[in-house]
Amino acid sequence: MSRVSQARNLGKYFLLIDNMLVVLGFFVVFPLISIRFVDQMGWAAVMVGIALGLRQFIQQGLGIFGGAIADRFGAKPMIVTGMLMRAAGFATMGIAHEPWLLWFSCFLSGLGGTLFDPPRSALVVKLIRPEQRGRFFSLLMMQDSAGAVIGALLGSWLLQYDFRLVCATGAILFILCALFNAWLLPAWKLSTARTPVREGMRRVMSNKRFVTYVLTLAGYYMLAVQVMLMLPIMVNDIAGSPAAVKWMYAIEACLSLTLLYPIARWSEKRFRLEHRLMAGLLVMSLSMLPIGMVGNLQQLFTLICAFYIGSVIAEPARETLSASPADARARGSYMGFSRLGLAIGGAISYIGGGWLFDMGKALAQPELPWMMLGIIGFITFLALGWQFSHKRTPRRMLEPGA
């Protein structure tokens, strides 16, 4: 085995271990924020939506800057610094009793993510061969789902005692992750050249097809991020207990672990990537529409199952499409910019969704936010269809098995 192949194989295992620590640290805390501050402390959902939207926008919206800096200085210092900054954000969240302090903690958490997320994604592009990326992204997503349910279970258990324990656990996990990277991550360059920050950003912005695709995905993310805000609140409202939220993540884990990799393997040989993305988005949109009209957990969990199945179909294709055009001279910049749709869609959906949720309750129309999300999903579906049919996408982005 050549040294390059050996480095790639070792890199895969490193990425998987690192990803598990990050996912556990995140999901111990974030799914419970809405339960803690809306249900336990009585805050308006829009206040928590602003906090979650701020974290999303800072982390993903500034990702191109974090990626460009990592292209210039390498992955390791950015990742370690970002992990420690997120740990500080979680520690601050544990003592938040006013909205401004929650917002500040989410700002710190998002800024940390800005530093570590783009270089971690760029390492995947660097270490995983193009023909293997779809399957590797599926493995990462299976791991995400398992880590999400384990993290949510642990966080729900700790929440019975004290929210500060929840935040302390998340902070400790990110400190461990920082130490893991500081100890074992080689000083790898992300790009084939030490690209200046401005040059990396220029290369991304000149790729109009990629920019259009990323911005169109904002509508997709408006649906996807509600697993952190309105879905947990809805489950808690119907069940009458925050303990039921863990079953929502258990459903996601079961579906992902049993279906994600087989569906990815089966569909990559039969359908183009853009068809898989659009099919998954359509299922997600259809499942969102009736959520506000359900009256029991069985109906709600059935719709959540359908939503997760749509995500299982769409996510590997979306990740592969986002990684395919990355210029080897500016990998960090490309992967940072690829998160901009999540920044825009997530921020709008968290703040707007929280506001619509409060308004729906006030007007006795709980279906209002869910109908709006379903409509946004359909508009995004049509926009992606127009883009893929009118703007010729490179064959390597579309071919089965690309």
From Swiss-Prot:
Record key words, sorted: Cell inner membrane, Cell membrane, Membrane, Transmembrane, Transmembrane helix, Transport
PANTHER family: MULTIDRUG RESISTANCE PROTEIN MDTH, RESISTANCE PROTEIN MDTM, PUTATIVE-RELATED-RELATED
Record-linked InterPro entries: MFS, MFS_dom, MFS_trans_sf, MFS_Transporters, Multidrug-R_MdtH
Annotated signal sequence range: none
Gene Ontology cellular-component terms listed: plasma membrane
Primary site of residence: membrane
Cytoplasmic topological domain: 1-12, 117-138, 186-213, 265-276, 321-339, 389-402
GO molecular function: transmembrane transporter activity
Designated name of the protein: Multidrug resistance protein MdtH
Matches recorded under NCBIfam families: PRK11646.1
Periplasmic topological domain residue ranges: 34-98, 160-164, 235-243, 298-299, 361-367
Keyword Ribosomal protein tagged: no
Gene: mdtH
Family: Belongs to the major facilitator superfamily. DHA1 family. MdtH (TC 2.A.1.2.21) subfamily.
Transmembrane segments: 13-33, 99-116, 139-159, 165-185, 214-234, 244-264, 277-297, 300-320, 340-360, 368-388
